[in-house]
Amino acid sequence: MATFKDIINYFRPDWRLSVVSIAASSIYEIVDLLVPYAIGQILNVLSNQPLDRPLQSAIASIGELINYPVNQTLSLGVLLGLIFLVTVVKAPTQPWLTSWFHWDIALRARRDKTQTTIAKVLTLPLEFYDENNPGRISGRVARGLANHTWTYPEIAGQLIPKLVRVLGIFVFILLIEWRIAILYLISFVVILSFTLKTLRRIIWHESRLDKYMENTESRTSELITNIKTVKAFATEANELKRQQQRLDREFTVVDYRIHKGYVKLLTWQKAIIQFCVFTILGLTLAATVDGRISLGHFVMTLTLSSMAYAELEPISNLAEVFARRYSSMLRFHEFLQEPIGSDSVGLLAAENQTASPYKFTGKIELSHVSFGYDDSRQVLQDINLLIEPYQTVALVGRSGSGKSTLVKLLLRYFAPQEGEILIDGQDIRTLDVGKYRRRLAIVHQEVDVFNGTVLDNLTYGRPNATLEQVKEACRIARVDEVMEHLPQGYYTVVGERGVRLSGGQRQRLGIARALLVEPDVLIFDEATSSLDYESERAIQLAMRSIQGTCTTIVIAHRLSTIREADKIVVLDQGRIAEVGSHDELLGHQGIYRRLHSLQETGELLN
């Protein structure tokens, strides 16, 4: 569970620079207090009242140093010089020693945490993405990074220095008249306590609002992704109404919970502040009349107390802004604390990218493999299967029989709960997952295409491939036929998710991309199930060209695509029901023969 400590640790790498920059900002705030102090002492000089003893000693030392008599002129000159140093000389240095470093720290942290976030995205287990909407994830990450970036300069550069300034004013007033200082302290304790109590309620409401916003962003992301379906069913008005209801719910939380609470806070603050200012005025005036403090101290006390109370509103504003962001920052850290997939350990290590690659013959053996996504149901049960090198093996069966799950185990997306999977006699769990996966390639039913050029997508798994190697892979996958119809050939931008390509073109691109990495094991996961006849025929020819060049595993619903497979494995309810060639299985009165009859004639055999 994320805590406030996680927000602090966000900036931990630059903690030394943070301490220096916060200290510098705080010192500048304290130094600013010398101006009202000096003005008060000038009034004492002009009204012939004594200066404070430390100041008298300092002026006397300066007089001795420059050989000038201590008089009104010297005193005024020293005080004016002090004001000049604080106001004029300090001004050009302050932005560089404060704002520059605060933003530098914030931007450095954003860069580092963005990299950490991307690493987290790349290493989270697949089930996380099955359970969480991409829009929800991206919204949480974007808000978390932005809020951290904006919050640090506000807290380190404004809130903390302002609190130090208020404390410094208390010390100044305490040295002048302790009774006034006690009232000042009590008033600030009361105001800050009430502020913190109110902000705790605001933070609770903000956590609700943050979840509502994630739901809205999630639905918006879905609308963009599925806009064709929305338009096809003419449900624009319904979707707009649903989003309006979500936005109204957010507005209710903001307006009647958060904003109303903050307005109440400001109302009480202003009432207490004005009462305290009036009370301090009366006490200071009484102390001056009684002769306990000088005229200069009277002016300085009123000026400093007014400055202190004037800081309360920006302090409250900053605290309120932090409270508004607090929930989203915690939810960002909750995302970072999500456990990475067991298959992702070491994937991002630099040595993993440069280590010597594996090389397999492609012999795969599954021995007593069982697996379930939860304890309630086993998806695969006691699977025993031997795939020889360079064989083409087809996996068929009804939907939900475990075909795709078996492939996920082979790719090490998940680990079998019982049994083992061997490749060339080695348990795949003992192999480096990155080096292992680079010897496998898969072509999905829906090929993932990035928003770039055709060449970028083709070389995704092998960026250093030559153009000749790319063209050879495209020839085998029949992508060269597609190139003739693209305006810029290999350099044509395919658009988000490959929207400028047809389904068949994306499939061919996926096959060429897989071939380019020269895998030892090539997997087709229902690669032709949603294609038209012409595209399916082209994919079949490409698959036929690949046969015998590597171990090939084909998941197929259309049995016409696997007639020439060396071995067909029929799965039923998570178990292997039949194994054999196309002709052998047709000779049995089994599941394969019934499925084949249904696809060929539309009639299901008994």
Q: Which stretches of residues belong to each language-model region?
A:
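An intracellular "coupling" helix at the cytosolic face of ABC transporter transmembrane type-1 domains
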Residues: 126, 143-152, 156, 164, ...
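Juxtamembrane helix-loop junctions of ABC transporter transmembrane domains
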Residues: 31-40, 44, 79, 84-134, ...
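ABC-type nucleotide-binding domain
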Residues: 352-606
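Transmembrane helices of ABC transporter permease
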Residues: 18-29, 89, 157-209, 282-293, ...
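Alpha-helical segments in transporter systems
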Residues: 16-41, 79, 83, 102, ...
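Transmembrane helix-loop-helix hairpins at lipid-water interfaces of multipass membrane proteins
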Residues: 19-93, 174-179, 291-295
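Cytosolic ends of transmembrane helices, especially the final helix of ABC transmembrane type-1 domains
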Residues: 231-235, 308-338
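Hydrophobic alpha-helical segments in the permease module
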Residues: 83-94, 188-192, 265-282, 295-317
